[in-house]
Amino acid sequence: AIFAEGEADFIDQFASTGLDEAGVVALLDVQGWFDLRQRPLPSTRAEIVEALVGRRFVTRQPEGLAITNLGALVLAKRLSDFDSVARKAVRVIVYDGVTKMQVKDGKDWVADSGYAVGFVKLVDQIHAETPASEEIRAALRQTTHAYPKKALREILGNALVHQDLSERGTGVVVEVYDDRVEIVNPGLPLLPVDRFIDENQSRNERLADALRQLGVCDERGHGMDAVVTHIEAHQLPPYQCRLGSRHTTVVLSRYKAL
């Protein structure tokens, strides 16, 4: 991970308490979780809960079962069901033009699903909002988007894993402009920007491990390396990284003809 350390125990704090097995299953997308793991859904709630406890997504308390912030962030059916992580949902804003002057109608929305269970759909939705062109190849009409989906996927996955969870009022924001995509991440980097590709510094490691195991982000240290590979293959300008007072922005720019 490349961003400064957040509050260490945030992911172990409780997002919801006093639940029974039915309550846990109602709040977490357990079917989606088992699908991502390519395993059949157990036949009983007790077995499902046991698996969740084993990953520390759920803990057993005297007053019942408790979903941890880790469990909610990764597997929530709706992040908005949990006060502690509701603001951690990814916000997507699509602008008309190259400035913030005009938001396209209906194009300011929040991805309310947990990071793992909603990730593929979220990447697809963001990619679909990027500029595209059509051309005929071998008598077939093909649509080509301005940015490789794999680069967007890696940058977004990195942003989720490396956000500063102690910044309670904000989460990751994706801004799509006509000429660029900006992914804004709460938190500042520990590493110098020019060492993002070559080095790795751990942060939110249990969240990162949970998301890696479910295919949301690349193996440790390879994510931004992969971004460079994908954007070079598409002849895009190098990505940029801008540091604000309490946030980090990664910018992916469109192809510019020489």
Regions found by a protein language model. Give the residues of each.
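Active-site helix-to-loop segments that bind/position phosphate- or nucleotide-bearing substrates
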Residues: 1-153, 159-167, 176, 189-200, ...
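Short, charged/polar, Gly/Pro-enriched secondary-structure boundary elements
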Residues: 82, 256-258
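Glycine-rich phosphate-binding loop
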Residues: 150, 201-235
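Short beta-strand/loop element within the Bergerat-fold HATPase_c
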Residues: 171-179
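Short Gly/Ser/Thr- and Asp/Glu-enriched loop/turn motifs at secondary-structure junctions
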Residues: 178, 243-247
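Glycine-rich/acidic phosphate-handling loop/turn and adjacent ATP-lid/helix
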Residues: 181-215, 258
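Glycine-rich ATP-binding loops of the HATPase_c
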Residues: 235-242
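Short C-terminal beta-strand
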Residues: 246-255
